[in-house]
Amino acid sequence: MSHPAKVETDAAYPLPGHMRAWVLGDPGQLSLVDKPIPMPGRAEVLVHIDAVAICATDLEIIHHGAPALIGGGEPFNKMFTPGHEYMGTVAGLGPGVDEYRVGQRVSVEVHAGCGQCKRCREGMYTACLNYGLNYGDVDKGHRANGFTTDGGFAEYAVNNINTLIAIPDSMSDAEATLVVTAGTAMYGLTELGGLVAGEGVAVLGPGPIGLLGVAVAKALGASPVVLTGTRDNRLQIGRALGADHVINVRSEDAVEAVRRITAGKGLDYVLECSGAPDAVDQAARMLNRGGRICLAAFPHQPVSIDVAYIVRNNIYLYGIRGEGKSAAHRAEALMSQKRFDATKIHTHTFGLHELPTALRYAREHIDDAIKVVVTTRNTELARAAVPADDKSMHGNTKVSDG
């Protein structure tokens, strides 16, 4: 395959003419197709995607569109490839790029801000004021892999150098896909929440962000760390990741338990990852005066909040989206130092051609799936084993709402 003259490649990592990629058609419909391999421009690299984890937001995009925004509108029937929690190997360097080398393993952040708006200048590029306003011109405005540009359910993707995080060979592919998840928790706990060692933290909801929130909080010296949820097996994973106390809210009142654990003083910080309708009110009552609540979940029902209680007790309430202020780099540092084992939340692995099954496992929590990872490392085997006209590979696949 010929490449633009200023794109640096390496014979040790040859590029084929096309790649396999899942593209979104109508809502809930994905097709595995051949697409041209994109070429990196200035300040960009081409990454061969080795593994991609499935996030609940991917499921929302596939079925409902938002928060993806392609060409100024919904992402359906635009040959758009979703997926945003991925890692891989650098396969090509755009003009002038010398920060990375071909063959280097990297984890990839989602967001590359415009770099010009107020929020980007503050380092809050996940809150870029130009999000989605590039309308297909990736040289302008905010770029978000799997949201406003093609993402990771493919063999290759182009990424801005500011979104790359170098990872050591000691970190597995699956673990590297979790850097962004841990970075999201890190962003909420430290950059926005100001968590310092010795402060007490509760995490509500043992999903991926919640479980890694426990791990990050403990690694940063929080004490005590309390995890609440409804599934005992997930609570035990949380304990293994550093929770000092776990509370099953089906059998115990979480607020009363926290008050008992803290001798009535309350905690300093709550990371709310459950999305339950009463979670914010419960979080407020777990805190001492001046405590902070970080909202990291998307409730599917209206939420009732006792604002007067929050005002009287000087409680701070804020939301996070993604992994701003380079928090993912700090999360990767903790993971590289083996301060916690993020792979405890990795439960299932599928091949790229099995993406619809992987999505179903993630959506329906089959076999208590927590983090489902899709790998491209067996793609060549799949190509050899499946005829080119096999509809399971090239045809439309309806991703059922289950």
Regions found by a protein language model. Give the residues of each.
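C-terminal hydrophobic helical "lid"/dimerization subdomain
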Residues: S2-G17, P277, D281-R285, S326-G402
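NAD(P)H dinucleotide-binding glycine-rich loop of Rossmann-like/cofactor-binding domains
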Residues: I37, G73-N77, H84, C114-L204, ...
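Rossmann-fold dehydrogenase core element
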Residues: R292-C294, I305-K344
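Glycine-rich beta-strand-centered segment in the early N-terminal region that forms part
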Residues: P38-V52, P67-R121, T126, P168-S170
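Glycine-rich cofactor phosphate-binding loops and adjacent beta1-alpha1 units
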Residues: L192-A197, L220, Q236-Y316, P356, ...
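Short N-terminal strand-loop motif that marks the start
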Residues: M1-M87, G151, E155, N159, ...
